[in-house]
């Protein structure tokens, strides 16, 4: 059988621990037998990031800007415990944060729904997509510890050297401060990405901040969203029969819990980080969540929404069998291949991605799944299989 051809390579960003193992298994079992897979490979495993002083992460992001579509494996963001484990030169920053800053994109995360996995919130009958602003805020912050008796100030120096100062706090005891920033251009890009995504999906957009408390920082987000919606998207939304809705973040959380789903929830960077995990878990599993970073100029980076599955990796190193959910990592590959096929006018590649996703969902709905889903599934006739056996079943599936 002739393999499906590709015109333009995907940017492939390899990762860490158990997801790195699954990454290679997916390629070997499900992709290279069918596709003449073209990728420009970057090893974002922590060992290689340390060897290159994290330059490989920057290089992979720039390659993504060049080629337009990337697929990324989960990676370790090191903490203090990882320093001796990997003999790190320094505590390297999150690769995702670096890539998001370079691409200035918005992260859209959507749960993968399957029969037998009932959301913990029964009213959620349709998926909720979290749109996470991927630039700035706490992820590009500056922090200090302040000794007792010190004074902390915000200082902004304009291009003419004029300073504007505001006292943060006069510390009577030891304390801490944190400086955050964002850019109006990035917020505007975030707004447009959300509105364009909504028009494509024909879904409402909800946006929430805490502008009643943060009257300059958060209020600027609110104002930019409203201005862009009114000037550029209101007529398009009305024609499509969808809405843009703004509320406070605490009210949004209450509304989300009561809702049926089926909309895009736009969140600032930290809110999106937290709420995407909450939404994914409430729908069933972080390993059943798609994630795509979309830049304002149409660049796409697909990844799983979960981490490196450290506990399973340590079992794997001991030679023990694992039953690790590969669905989100697999859907990162299918999402990237479908987008590459769309951009390069390769319907066969797009159809392959569709069929592989269909085979995955049908296999789970037929009762065959990994351990995490086995514990959640309400199906009567269900079977737990190991990591590799699940992928091999997809290889032999009629849908694939």
Tell me what each language-model feature is:
Residues 4-6, 18-23, 28-52, 61-64:
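N-terminal alpha-helical transmembrane segments of multi-pass membrane transport
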Residues 5, 146-179:
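Gly-rich Lys/Arg/Thr-decorated short loops/hinges at beta-loop-alpha junctions or inter-strand turns
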Residues 13-25, 172-246:
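Glycine-rich phosphate/diphosphate-binding loop of Rossmann-like nucleotide-binding domains
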Residues 36-41, 201-209, 233-246, 341-353, ...:
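Flexible, glycine/charged-enriched surface loops at secondary-structure junctions
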Residues 48-156, 270:
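N-terminal glycine-rich phosphate/adenylate-binding segment common to multiple enzyme folds
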Residues 256-355, 359-363:
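Glycine-rich phosphate/nucleotide-binding loop
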Residues 395-400:
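Conserved small/polar residues in nucleotide/adenosyl-binding loops
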